[in-house]
Amino acid sequence: MRKATNKNWQRVTAAAAALALCAGVLTGCGASSSTAAGSTAASSAAASEVSSEEADEMAAKNVADLIDAIYVQERNENTDAQCEAAKAAWDALTDAQKEMVEGEEASPEYFGRDTGDASKDDARNQDNIGDNEILVVSFGTSFNDSRAADIKGIEDAIQAAYPDWSVRRAFTAQIIINHVQARDGEKIDNMEQALERAVANGVKDLVVQPTHLMHGAEYDEMMEMVDSYRDQFESVAIAEPLLGEVGSDATVINADKEAVAKAITAEAVKTAGFDSLDAAAEDGTAFVFMGHGTSHTAKVSYSQMQSQMNALGYKNVFIGTVEGEPEETACENVIEAVKAAGYTKVVLRPLMVVAGDHANNDMAGDDEDSWKSQFEASGEFDSVDCQIAGLGEVADIQQLYVAHTKAAVDSLNG
């Protein structure tokens, strides 16, 4: 982005003056006053042009600063006003100015990227909760279509299974909460807000159902927050994440992991147009599920999912992670594993509850470091296709969450 500094201003006005002087020399010093007027106009036009460019840059920088101010993990007393101000400033920009927005985290995509219809979602932040609440806790996503299909899909399934309970929502990522609020005007509770709402509404029995995959860092933080509110309720139960207990090493698998492995593989095979996984294998097609990865000890869950796929005889299904933790799940290692197994076609699909930023960019993006690009760049495969769909929209996965919720509800009565 070209900056119009004071030196630029001086250079331009000096150049304009020089042009005016040249014009005077060429027409003679005794030229009429119209020559002088023309020179002044040329100088003013040049100065005006720089001034306009500076104004564009200042307007774009203002929006970038406002976006960076709300791209934070902590909510404060100014957050609502900051979100509103950022959107108002963005809306006031011209299309050209919007393309100039660039900050530490800010870019034109923050407000400008179309991620679907936010009105299809339900923030589930209503009062009048009643005595019994199921609080569904998710990391969150700013991708509207995925939020409605994946997170709302899980919440709807739980609400259908428990019509006498009030299902409410909390996100743990304040950055995402702020993004959705600023761009779409949808206010989603963070954990503290959701728990305070439950207390204010006189909730007696609270069940917390995380949509997290595993007992990782996000789960631990959620537990700490819930523990700090336990004495505000008559009873509290926390349900299992999707993959259930972690286990001690990569060989440990359980009923949850088996159910997830079967559900996601069946969905991927069907979406790819095959009658069976074996038919896909005969076609030379491998399925690669890309998770997030973590440095938390729960990262062994990804290795366990690969063990589970192997135990089921799913020889053309591979597990990877964006972060490359565990090490064998790094993209380059998965590429080598698929290549060594002799498959010539690859289908990539996220091993994530939502198909958000990681699925759209890290997996299926056009950048050279996306998984799609890396598989293609290896030169080992005839085709690399992507299925951009989160786990949350899969009906069988939704029912696994319902089963975990049921176990937690039953524990309150036991």
Q: Model-found features: residue ranges?
A:
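Bacterial Sec-dependent N-terminal signal peptides
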Residues: 1-16
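C-terminal motif of bacterial Sec signal peptides marking the signal peptidase cleavage site
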Residues: 24-28
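Extended amphipathic ligand-handling, pore-lining, and cofactor/metal-binding catalytic surfaces
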Residues: 53-58, 105-347, 352-414
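Intrinsically disordered, low-complexity serine/threonine-rich repeat tracts
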Residues: 34-53
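Bacterial signal peptide processing site
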Residues: 30-32
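Beta-rich interaction/scaffold domains
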Residues: 49-114
